[in-house]
Amino acid sequence: MVASAAAMDASKYVRYTPEQVEALERLYYECPKPSSLRRQQLVRECPALANVDPKQIKVWFQNRRCREKQRKESSRLQALNRKLTAMNKLLMEENDRLQKQVSQLVYDHGRHGVAAAGMMRRVPAFPPQAAAAAGHQLATATDTSCESVVTSGHHHQQQQHNVVQPPPRDASPAGLMSIAEETLTEFLSKATGTAVEWLQMPGMKPGPDSIGIIAISHGCAGVAARACGLVGMEPAKVAEILKDRPLWLRDCRSMDVVNVLPAGANGTIELLYMQLYAPTTLAPARDFWLLRYTSILDDGSLVVCERSLSSKQGGPSMPLVQPFIRGEMLPSGFLIRPSDVGGSVIHIVDHMDLEPWSVPEVVRPLYESSAMVAQKISMAALRYLRQVAHEDTRSVITGWGRQPAALRALSQKLTRGFNEALNGLADDGWSVIESDGVDDVCISVNSSKVIGCNATFSSGLPIVSTGVLCAKASMLLQDVSPPSLLQFLREHRSQWADSNLDAFFASTMKPNFCNLPMSRLGGFSGQVILPLAHTFEPEEFLEVIKLGNASNYQDTLVHRDLFLLQMYNGVEESSAGTCSELIFAPIDASFSDDSPLLPSGFRIIPIDSPLDTSSPNCTLDLASTLEAATPRSRISGVNGGGGGCAAAAASSSSKAVMTIAFQFAFDGHLQDSVAAMARQYMRNIISSVQRIAVALSSSRLVPPGAGAAAAQLSPVTPEAATLPRWICQSYRFHFGDELIKSVDANSSNESILKAVWHHPSAILCCSLKAMPVFTFANQSGLDMLETTLVALQDMTLEKVFDDQGRKNLCTELPNIMEQGMACMEGGVCVSSVGRAASYEKAVAWKVVDGDGGGAHCICFMFINWTFL
C-alpha cells in the first residue's frame, strides 16, 4: 500500500532537468496544446524525455497553459490597475478645476449682489427715468436664467477682452513672441483653469473603457470642446502626431507651414495656413491663418498652442482665398505630460469661430455646435492616438492580411476623395456644369483627373477614363435616425442602387468600354458584406462589398462579381454631434493599395437633438409601409391608431442634413451623356432615400406606454394592426382549431399581436407574388432566420428551404392556393447567414382579410425547430 502511494507520488511530482524543460518549452511555443501523437513524437525525438511518463508530459502542458493564462491575466489586471490609477488622478485634477470654477462663480455672484445692493440704496436719489433704467439693469444683473447668464457672461468677457486688449504687434520675432506667450497663457487657462465654463458632453461618461473626459463650452464666444485622456505613447510622439493635422483630421484639406522661427530654449513659432473641407454642399469651405507655438513648461510638460492671426493681434497677414471663408481659431492646442504609469496625459482644447453668418440658416446649427467640434476634432484626435498606441503595443494583422496603417490609409483615401468631390474646388480641377434648373442636383466635372495616366489593373490593362463627373445634392431629413437610415442603405443596396451603373463602374476599369447603360433600379442577385476591419473604437467599419451582378449590361464585359470598398461610420445613435457616413468606391479584384478610388456615398449630419432612442430596433414591416398610402397620412396617423404616434413624433422631432455625392469616370466624348445619366440617377436616389426615410420615420412612431410587442410592430397601418387577427381567423377556418388557445374573437388586436409574437413556433408570412418575399415574422421566426423585420423583405421564400424543401414547396404550393392549406413533413431550412435549422413539421395556410375575404398572404408555421 505504502509502495503504491510512493509510486503514485513519484508519477505525480516530477523534477525535470534543464534539458527536458528546454525541449518541452520548445514544443510549447510551437504548439501549446499538442495531441497525443505529437507528444509521443516528442518523446521519440528527444532522448532526454525517454524516462518521463507520457501522462506526466500531458500534465506538464496543462500546467504550462494554466501558468501562461495566469500570467496574461495578471499582466492584464496590472495594466488595468495602472490605467485606473492614472484615470483617478486625472479625475481628481478635473475635480480641483471644478472646485476653482465653483469658487469663481460664488465670488462673481457675491460681487454682483454687492453691486445690486449699492444700486438699491441709491435708487431714491434717482429721477423717475433713471430709477427705471437702474431697475432694468438690476433685473439683468440678478436674473439667473440661462439666457441671462449666457448673455451677461458674454458681455462680461467682451468687457474684459476690451480692457486687456494689447496694442497691435508687428511681424518681427519679438512681436510674434509676444503673441505666442499671450496665446500660451490663454490656452492654459482653458485647458486647466476656469476661463471657459465646461459642461460634460451628453452621452460621454468617464471610465476605464471610455475615450476620456469630454466637455463642451457653455456661454462663451464661438464653439469650443475640451478632451482629457490617457495614451500609451511618449509625449514627443504624441506631439508629432497631433501637429500633423491632415494625418488624423479627415476634414483637413491641407496645412502648410509658411515660416518657422526659434523661440527660447527648445521652442518654435510656426506660421500655418490651413484649409478645412465643408461637410455639405450647402456651405463653403473654411481656411485659417494661424500662429503655432511649441514649448516645454517648467514642470516638463510639452505644450503646443495656436491661434488665428488677424488685425486685432497684429503680425503678418494672409490674403483671403476664394471660395474659402476665413475662420478664427481662438487660443487652442494640447498639453502633454508624462504619466506616472507610462504613456502620456493629454489635454486638448479646440476653440473656434466658424463664422456661422456665412451659411444658410438651415445648416447654421452645424457651425454653432460645440458637440460637433468635439466629435470631429477633439475626440478624433484621441481616437487616432489610441488606435496607433494599440497597434504599437502588439502585432496586429487585420482583414485580408493588411497592416492597420494600410487600412487607415484606405479609410483616409475614401473620405478625402469624397470630400474633394463634394467641395469641387477649382484648384483641384473641378468646374460646374450649368444646371437645368429643375432641382438642386449639382453636376461638376474634373477633366484634369485622368484615372489612367500610370495606373493599371491586375490584368495589365490601363485604366483609360479621361475625366471624372460628380453629381451631388443635399436634402433635409426629419424624424429619422441617421444611423438607422444608413444601416438600411448599407444592408439593402437593391432598394436604391442601379445594378447597370455598378456594371458601368466596372466597365470603366477596362479599356474600350462602350455605351452607357440604361438606368433601371434593382437587378441584383444579392450582396455579400466581407468585413475588412474596424477601428479600436467600434464606431467605424471598413468592408468589401461583393455584388452578384444580375445585369444584362455588356455581359461580355461583366462576367464576374463586382467589388466595392466601403466605409461605414457613425453607428452610435446616442452620441451628440455624431456624423454618420456610408462611403464606397469600386475596386478591382486585385485590391492593391495604390489602386485609384472614386468614392461616392452618403453623409448625414444631425442639426439638432437626436431622436429618442428608447426603441432602437425598427421592426415595422418596411415593405408594406413603403407600398402604403401617402406619407402624410402615415405620419399624421390618419389611418387609425396614429394620434399617439403623431404626438410622439412631435415630441421627438429632429432634423438632419443628408449630403449625397456620386462620382463617375467617363471618356471625353461621353460627357454630355454621362451628365444626363448622373442627374437622373441622383434624382432616383433622392426619391428612394425619401421613401425609405418616411418608412423608417413611421416605424419609430410607437405610442408611449405600448407593450413590447407593440413596440416591435407599431400599428401605424391597419394591416399591421389586424394581420395577427387575420392569421388566427384563417387558421381557425382552414384547420378547425385555434392557433392560440388563450385568445378568441373578442380579444383585442394588441393581445392577439402579443400572443402571435411570442408563439413558440416560427410563424412567417410571405407575399402572393411571382417571387414570394417575407413580409412578417414573429420573434421565433426572426430567431430561426437570424434577421430582423426590416431586413425580412430581402429574403425570398425559396431561399429559406434546402433542395428537398424547395421540391416539397413546389409540390404543395398549388394545394395551398386551391385548398387554402397544406401540411409538410419535417426538413431543413436555412437562415439569412447560412445556418441550417431543422423543423419537425411545417403547416401553411392562406391568410384572407377580414372584409372581402380576398387572399392577403400565405402563412407558414415551422414547429419544434432547432439549429443543427
Curated annotation (Swiss-Prot):
Start and end residues of each START domain: 169-397
Cellular component GO terms, alphabetical: nucleus
One Gene Ontology term of the molecular function aspect: DNA-binding transcription factor activity
Signal sequence interval, chain numbering: none
Compartment(s): Nucleus
Coiled-coil ranges from the UniProt annotation: 64-106
The organism's place on the tree of life at top rank: Eukaryota
SUPFAM superfamilies (alphabetical): Bet v1-like (SSF55961), Homeodomain-like (SSF46689)
Summary of the tissues where the protein is detected: Expressed in phloem.
Spans annotated as Disordered: 150-171
Keyword Coiled coil: yes
Family affiliation: Belongs to the HD-ZIP homeobox family. Class III subfamily.
Free-text function comment from the UniProt entry: Probable transcription factor that may be necessary for the proper patterning of vascular bundles.
PANTHER family per UniProt: HOMEOBOX-LEUCINE ZIPPER PROTEIN ATHB-14, HOMEOBOX-LEUCINE ZIPPER PROTEIN ATHB-15
This protein's name: Homeobox-leucine zipper protein HOX29
Taxonomic classification: Eukaryota, Viridiplantae, Streptophyta, Embryophyta, Tracheophyta
Gene label: HOX29
